[in-house]
Amino acid sequence: MCNFCKSHDLLMEFYPRDEKVLGKKRDVLVHKILNSRKKRQYDCIVGVSGGTDSIYTLYMAKKEGLNPLAVHFDNGWNTDIAVKNIENATTKLDVDLYTYVVNWEEFKSLQK
């Protein structure tokens, strides 16, 4: 078996594409989180960009009964619609939002 096939098989063990398997793994994880609740304000952190995937993840966390903290990394490249999506989703889902705004000059120097 070639290296690519071995890598694929290994990845499929950890990240299966079968919805039944994924659903069971998700259920186990959510159950574990809910059962380990202490007196914390949040159950999990969901990174939000304003795109479909992160907004849907936030929605699913709430649907599963979790109390997520939405975290957004503002690097200065946000679109107006992404910002509006984040505002709408966090308001509608009643989720707290923490936005970290980078120092643009420092961030720019890291990209060189």
Labelled PLM ranges:
Residues 1-112:
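ATP-dependent adenylation/nucleotidyltransferase module used to activate substrates
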